[in-house]
Amino acid sequence: MIIERLIGNLRDLNPLDFSVDYVDLEWFETRKKIARFKTRQGKDIAIRLKDAPKLGLSQGDILFKEEKEIIAVNILDSEVIHIQAKSVAEVAKICYEIGNRHAALYYGESQFEFKTPFEKPTLALLEKLGVQNHVLSSKLDSKDRLTVSMPHSEPNFKVSLASDFKVVMK
């Protein structure tokens, strides 16, 4: 089965009214536009999203829905660094340092909390900066992602040479 668009999200439905099968994804797989996966029940699915969300797939995104059957996204828990800033200045410092490493940064549960995938160098940096943090297991859901840049993404436009020798971007 080939999935070309998202249908909605489980949070907008009552999942008890449906038979839900899940595709388990790691946080870093949620930004793939083209991929093959197996559901928990063993169904093969291919994803070729034409209008993929800029932030990536989110927890509960519905990939397939037919009558009472749904296939939805489940983002697996992963090891994360949970960061707790003490001030707005510390938030700026955290965002700068994490961004400078091109690491993913996610909102936490409250205003001054953030999460980033666990990496020893990042943990050492936060310790060196005196930023309060601890390592835990948590979902990194795309809807909570602060950054939308994709350093290795392909351009979304076609460049061609016009007859008047001007570069045209479509």
Curated annotation (Swiss-Prot):
GO biological process: protein folding; protein-containing complex assembly; urea metabolic process
Gene Ontology terms for molecular function: nickel cation binding; unfolded protein binding
Main location: cytoplasm
Organism: Helicobacter pylori (strain Shi470)
InterPro entries named among the record's database cross-references: UreE (IPR012406), UreE_C_dom (IPR007864), UreE_N (IPR004029), UreE_N_sf (IPR036118)
Cellular component annotations (GO), alphabetically ordered: cytoplasm
Gene this protein is translated from: ureE
Disulfide cross-links: none
Protein name: Urease accessory protein UreE
Similarity-based family: Belongs to the UreE family.
Any Pfam family matching the protein: UreE_C
UniProt KW keywords: Chaperone, Cytoplasm, Nickel
NCBIfam families membership: PRK13261.1-6 (NF009754)
Entry's transmembrane regions: none
Cellular localisation: Cytoplasm
Role description: Involved in urease metallocenter assembly. Binds nickel. Probably functions as a nickel donor during metallocenter assembly.
